[in-house]
Structures are given as structure tokens and as C-alpha cells.
Amino acid sequence: MDWAEIETIVYSEHDHPENILGPHKVKGGVLIQAFLPDAKTVFVRSKKSGMFIQMSQTDEDGCFAALMESRKIVSYEYVIDYGDGKEYWQKDPYLYGNLIPEQALEDFNAGKAYDIYRYLGAHPVAVKGIGKDVLVDWNPMAASTKRSDMVQGTFFAVWAPNAMRVSVVGDFNQWDGRRHPMCRLGDSGVFGLFIPD
């Protein structure tokens, strides 16, 4: 673990949190890292096998890590105990990657993205798959797309070319900008993050 990188998450100074948080292939498996302030214990549950792996707390501010013995990145979710006697199940936003098509970002950089409104702002979406292989349904309210194999959520994107970092905040994360830092998408100045329901 790179402690300097971890500190950039803790102090909200990283514009590419996906380079630290979420799943990463390493020697021996897949390293999963999360920043969950106030959590007492965290488990990773593989959706494929149903197996639970306890995460180690690597930093007193709320950084957790676990090594999943797997050759490839698989879908998973967190099971979190905040010490209030309840279990909270949460999907990892950093499992899904960028949802804006690369061509749309290239057009935006060139000043010819006439439909960028389709991506900027907050949009309910449904996704299937993980990482770079994710398929996005930008119209998840249609009856034909309400399928159990798709993850429902909201995709947030904003153009902030001079920002050091951008976060999604609200009641759902105690207005804590460290909990959902957005990812800088290439050289476009756009930051984005998909937050599953």
C-alpha cells in the first residue's frame, strides 16, 4: 500500500481516486481498497461465489483493504458494521469505471459535443458488467431495462477543468466529500462517478 496515496484520499486531494480505491489486479489476486470512515468492520462479499472476506483496517481514518484470491476482477459488495448493531450492504462505486463514451469526451474537448447534456449532471442509469466492460442503459426507467442482472444507480458528471478534486455529497454520505470523490476523465476537465443504489 502506498501511504502517500492513501493520505490523498483521507485529505481529499486526489483527482483519480479510482487509482487507489476499488479493485486492482496485483500479484496473488485482486486488491480491494475502500475508504469508509467510522466503519468498525468491513467484509467484501463476492457476488459470484458468495464468499465473505474480512477487510483489514489499514488506516485509523477509515481505509480498509482485502486481497481476493482471483485471477480476474469479479463483482462484489461491502458488508459494513458501523457499531450500531446493523449491517449495511453497499456496492463499490469504483467497480464500474467511466460511463461516458470516449467519443463523447473527445467531441467535448473539440468543442463539438452537442449532446453533452446527456452525460453532465445527475442521471439515473442501469449498468451491466464491471470496469471497462460495463454496458450502460441511459434510459433505465423503460420497462424493458428493469432486469435483475443490471445495477441501478445515478451517474454524476460535472465539468470542472481547474478543480483539484470534485466529490458527490448528500445526506446519503453525511455530506462528507471524502466518501465519494469523483474521477477525472482524461484531459476533458470532466469528473464523473456512478453511485449504485
What are these regions (language model features)?
Residues 1-38, 90-164:
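Non-catalytic, glycine-rich low-complexity segments
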Residues 23, 31-73, 79-98, 127, ...:
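Aromatic-rich carbohydrate-binding modules that target alpha-glucans
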